[in-house]
Amino acid sequence: HNDARRQRQMCIRDRVYSSKQDYFDWLERLEQFEENINNAYKINKRGLSEGYTQPKLVTKGVVAQLESIINSEIQSNPYMKVFIEADENLLTEDEKAELINSAETLIENKINPAYKKLHDFLKDDYLINSRDSIGIKDIPNGKEYYEFLARFYTTTDLTPEEIHNIGLQEIQRIRSEMEEIIRQVNWDGDFGSFLNYLRTSPRFYYDNGEDLFNAYLIMSKTIDPLLPKIFKEFPRAPYGVKPIPAESAPFTTTAYYNSPSPGRPGYFYANLYKPESRPKYEIPVLTVHEAVPGHHFQISIAQELENVPTFRKYQGITAFVEGWGLYSEELGEYINIYDDPYDKFGQLTYDMWRAIRLVVDTGTVSYTHLRAHETIHHL
C-alpha cells in the first residue's frame, strides 16, 4: 500500500502549510515529480529486460491506479487539491490563482504525460511479460534473495521452512481460541457457518462511510483515557484519525499510520471504501495497532528520543515495527476493549491473518507450497 505514487500524494497532503512560502516550495517540489515518474519508467524497463518483473496481479493494479489519475478531472487531481484548498489567510487572491494556474499547467504538460508514458509501457509491454506466479523465487536468484529477505525482515537466522512451521503452529493455537469464542456466544453451527454469519449479517456493518469513520473516532477517544493504566511515558506528538483518500482507497489496505513531523500530528488512516465489507469487530484491534498504543507510540517516542544517533530515531525494522503492533493488540486485553466476544474474535482474526501469511508467503518459495494451500483450504 506504500508505493511511490501514494508517497508523492501523501507528502503533499500531510505537510503543514503555515506560510505563503510553504505553498510555493511545494509547487517547486511538484516540478521534480516528472523526473521521479520517468525514473520509475526507466527502472521498470530495465527490470523487464533483465527478467525482474512483478506478478500480473500487481501490474494490473498499478495500471488501474495510473488510469484513475490520468483520467481524473484536473480540479479533482490529487496534486491540485492542496492548492485549490489553500488557506486564504496565507495567500492573496492573486497568489492563490497563480499557484492553481501553475500547478494545472505542470500537471497537464509534464506530470500527466509522464504518467501516461509509464502507464502505456506497463499496460502494453510490461503486463504481458509480468509473472503469472506471485512467488519471488521466479525472478533470477529468487530463492536466495527470499532467504536473505527472511533474515533481513525478521532479524533472525530462521529459514523460510522454520518460519512456515511457526505459522502452522500459530494457526492451530489461534483456531482453538476462536473455537472458544464461538462456544461463548452459543453459536449453533460449525466454524464455517459462524464465519459466514460474521461476513453477511448486517449487524456487523455500517451503511455508510461517515458512520464507519465516526466509529473509529469514538474508539480512539475511548482508548486515550485508558492508556495511563498500561503506560507511564507518552509521546509529545498528538495523533489524529483521517479517512484514506478516495482516489487510493479501492487499491490499498484497511488502515495505515503516517508518522508525525514538526508542526504536524501523526495520523491513523482508515479505509472507508465499501463500508459494507469492513466489519465493526475489526475497529478495536485496528485502532490499537495503528494508532495508540500502536504505531503512534512506537514511532513518535522513537523520534523524540534524546542522545541517540538520528538514524536510530527513524530506522524502521519490520520485526520490531509490526511486532510492536501485535504487542499493542494484546495490550487491548488489559484495557478491556475486547469486552464484546465479537471484538475479541476480530482481534483473533487479525492474529490468524498474520499466521496464514507466514504459511502462504514461505510456501510460495519452497517445497511447502502444496502444504500451504492444503492448510488454507482446510481453514
Regions found by a protein language model. Give the residues of each.
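Single conserved hydrophobic/aromatic residue that forms the stacking wall/gate
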Residues: 2-8, 12, 369-372, 376-379
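Conserved functional hotspot residues or short segments at active or partner-binding sites
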Residues: 15-156, 160, 165
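Active-site-proximal, well-structured secondary-structure segments within enzyme catalytic domains
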Residues: 109, 113-267
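Short pre-active-site segment immediately N-terminal to the catalytic Zn-binding motif
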Residues: 272-286
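Catalytic Zn2+-binding segment of zinc metalloproteases
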Residues: 292-305
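Post-HExxH zinc-binding segment in Zn-dependent metallohydrolases
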Residues: 299-300, 311-340, 358
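Long, amphipathic alpha-helical stalk/connector segments used for oligomerization, subunit docking
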Residues: 334-371
